[in-house]
Amino acid sequence: MQTQARPPVPQGPRFNHPATPQQVRRPINAPLPGQTAQIQGNRGPQPPKKKKRYADKLIQPKVRELVPESQAYMDLLAFEQKLDSTITRKKIDVQEALKRPQKIKKRLRIYISHTFIAGKEPEKEGDDASVPMWELRVEGRLLDDMQHPTVGANPRPAPKRKFSSFFKSLVIELDKDIYGPDNHLVEWHRTPQTNETDGFQVKRPGDRPVKCTILLLLDYQPMKFKLHPRLAKVLGIAAETRPRIIEALWQYIKTHKLQDPQDRDTINNDLFLEQCFGVSKMRFMEIPQRLHQLLQQPDPLVLNHIIQRPDDGQDKTSACYDIDVELEDPVKQQMANFVHNQTNANDIQLLDQKIFDLVDQINEMKLRRDFFLRFSNEPSGFIKKWVVSQNSDLKTLTESSGDGESDRYATTYSTTDTDEGVSRYMYQKIQQKRAELEQSLGIRNN
């Protein structure tokens, strides 16, 4: 046979089944070389690039049969999918945990000390005399900061909290008999413009022993409330945040089955709750309002101290007290960083795009291989099928699709499928209009 066949174009054909002529048909978007310029000139704007999916990373089973080593890639792909799902699930768990307040308890050591400054007599005329004075200092720090000092191995240590940041207010009450009713109180209250400090200092003239009372009100975040003694005894908590108090009350109601069996929104108070709220029944929505009357500001810390000279019978001039304070869990910041970490997102996208491109190249190579394999097995028959396919594609590219003359007549569309589709459509419309009419007339169809 002397017929010379033109070799296939580099792109190679796209096909579906090995036994049909369509398997060697050139795709519509790959015209003959002579027609490329004409087709591209008639194209409109390019559609947006299709987003790749996980399925686009998969290698076809026929490729895996030809290359058994590709199974290792599929195993890595399955492991990556499992790892991604695990990370996503953990991020969701972390996000839920971040919504809840996370506090840790630490011990704050408060130091109270005083010193005396002796007065000076004028050495000669014209010199100013100074009266004796005392200075009271209230300081403090966390015990963890003292036991675990910052070492050089940590380049960015966590910032230490100032002593004043733990309190909402501080009041020092001095002896009223000595300093009078107008000068015996020293107060500090937190404001939005407050600058935090590591301690407080108070200076006053005098060298006599002075009794002072230090009142410290802790700054709870979120705010805590002190419960009425009766309610505190019932719930077993003395001071807590409002949501925790409501939760504890609800648990008490559920445990003692105080919900009305007929009206679940009604609470039948037992003897103890009736003594607290003053009613035998109450609506569930009334609980926050009634509970507000039983909540008070927490009591301040009261520290008593005597300012006097050591030689007046006192061996020490300082005292320390340990109290428990609540701090934000440092792990919470690490959890937030984990959720919002996008450091490697761009690198992962670039690597995914490389994988997509490589898989596309592998699939394209598989098409070319099948093309040339069929050509080598049966050259003459393959060329005939390929020419027929190219001829069909050429007609599709150069002629308008469809038969315009036959499309003008109704007999073209008169088929059993068309009749059934029209009947179903009309029946559906009739039922829809009937339902609208019955609804407007108030007729209920049983």
Swiss-Prot record:
Disruption phenotype: RNAi-mediated knockdown at the L1 larval stage reduces brood size. RNAi-mediated knockdown reduces expression of tph-1, which encodes a component of the serotonin synthesis pathway. RNAi-mediated knockdown reduces the level of bed-3 and col-124 mRNAs and increases the level of lin-29 mRNA. Simultaneous knockouts of swsn-2.2 do not survive beyond the L2 larval stage. Simultaneous RNAi-mediated knockdown of swsn-2.2 at the L1 larval stage causes sterility, while at the L3 larval stage, causes embryonic lethality for the progeny. The keyword Transcription applies. Broadly expressed in all cell types. Its main location: nucleus. It holds the Pfam family SWIB. Residues 1-53 are annotated as: Disordered. InterPro entries: SWIB_domain, SWIB_MDM2_dom_sf, SWIB_MDM2_domain. It comes from the Eukaryota. Belongs to the SMARCD family. This is SWI/SNF chromatin-remodeling accessory subunit 1. It comes from Caenorhabditis elegans. The gene is ham-3.
